[in-house]
């Protein structure tokens, strides 16, 4: 069995906050793969189901972020799950918005949810780090993570969550490297169009007659670009 934990804070007022992107990922997993109903257990909400034939327990701790490890530790002890079978979706300040990294073990990087998990679970669990970007100064971090995603951020957030969930079979099958590669491929921003090739000598001569002058003009700004 795999234990898949989403980190976040319980309550509707926190639903769209950056700190709750782990909850968002687990909620989408629950819907897409037809998990059973949410039940209150282990100081949180749990749901049982399977992904690609692998039995999975979803967990959203109801302890608030700083005590997330208490809920995960209880579930692990009950089901005799080892740390390497635990997958944690969480927000990551040190990654640009929309970037994802998957790693096993490591430090908490100041993330209080991970700090609590380290205390109750150990450090040898898998982390799916979902980049939310950094506000620029330490003083602004709390306000940043506890603020809602802006409307403009939905352009990368929704496709990213879709990709995280669509490729989940790779993750639960124990292929995190392939999972991370697929996420990067599916969420790669479109490349800007290449500049037009310079016209050949013959085209230069006819351009002066007004027949191809228009096609020789450089294109305007690419649609959708914000600079």
From Swiss-Prot:
One MF term in the entry's GO annotations: tRNA binding
Binding site for tRNA: 14, 64, 66, 112
Region ranges (Disordered): 182-227
Cell location: Cytoplasm
The protein's enzyme class: hydrolase
Example of a GO biological process term: rescue of stalled ribosome
Annotated site residue numbers, Stabilizes the basic form of H active site to accept a proton: 91
EC nos: 3.1.1.29
UniProt keyword list: Cytoplasm, Hydrolase, RNA-binding, tRNA-binding
A GO CC term attached to the entry: cytoplasm
Described function: Hydrolyzes ribosome-free peptidyl-tRNAs (with 1 or more amino acids incorporated), which drop off the ribosome during protein synthesis, or as a result of ribosome stalling.
Family: Belongs to the PTH family.
Name of the protein in its database record: Peptidyl-tRNA hydrolase
Annotated source species: Rhodospirillum centenum (strain ATCC 51521 / SW)
